[in-house]
UniProtKB/Swiss-Prot annotation:
PROSITE patterns: RIBOSOMAL_L27. One of its GO terms (molecular function) is structural constituent of ribosome. GO terms for biological process: translation. It comes from Methylorubrum populi (strain ATCC BAA-705 / NCIMB 13946 / BJ001). NCBIfam families: L27. PANTHER family: LARGE RIBOSOMAL SUBUNIT PROTEIN BL27M, RIBOSOMAL PROTEIN L27. The keyword Ribosomal protein applies. Keywords: Ribonucleoprotein, Ribosomal protein. InterPro entries: Ribosomal_bL27, Ribosomal_bL27_CS. This is Large ribosomal subunit protein bL27.
Amino acid sequence: MAHKKAGGSSRNGRDSAGRRLGVKKFGSEAVIPGNIIVRQRGTKWHPGTNVGMGKDHTLFALVPGKVQFETRRGREFVTVVPLAQAAE
């Protein structure tokens, strides 16, 4: 009787590349319009003031300013405080 399994082709050994999701600009970092703030699947973070959302739920800056993360009504929001207000 053979004590070893016959060597065949393995059915494992595949993996997909990481999707590079996550926060790209952290709290109080400076951004310009079009800068990506968060790449995400679904709405873990919601767009706040001066932040737009792409069709893949990517959040991006609409005005130059500083990034701010905040929780309102049990949801996490990302806002951009415009430069004029951020300086005050």
